[in-house]
Amino acid sequence: GMERYYVEEPWSPINATIKRPEGFVVYEEVDWKPCTEFRGEPVGRYAAYLLEKRGIDHFTAVSKVQSLLRRKVNYAGIKDANAVTYQIIYVDTSGKEPEIKEWEGNGLRLKFLGFIKGKYNHTGNVFEITLDFSDEYTDELRRRIARVADLGRLPAFIGYQRFGTRRPTTHVVGKMLVLREWCNAVDFIL
């Protein structure tokens, strides 16, 4: 598979689960603060929105919002598919008030936050992960969390979870494209 380990420890498996999507929450950071605290300006070229999505892949969400707002959607990063995510998106309104200020449906929620002049300062993402496990693992999990916290940060892992697929074959499709084997690439996608 496409698993990745960033901490070299001889840890044995722990029987824990993450209830998806609610147990995996991602907040985009803007100027080192959660995007839920972001407020735009009274004027600007772009209308900024808070986008909340639940259990929907990024590109499906963007496509739906583009259809709704009838404008190209800009964003700073792709958020996880099987999660609850919060991020800022923005559309060019040439400074005009947007027709839609709030909207909710199909696992998506939009809220107009004001205007921005251009790209905002995306400083990272914050993850809230809720594990379900039996009490026997509490002390061990605390030790492991402390060990990971000592690292200060974890590198970004961009894999199949971003694209909402249960079949992690994007690396194989990429190889087929590089080799110019178009039919094989399509076969792996299908």
Question: Where in this protein do the model-derived segments appear?
Answer:
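Extended, charged/glycine-rich binding lobes that contact polyanionic ligands
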Residues: 1-46, 50-56, 64-190
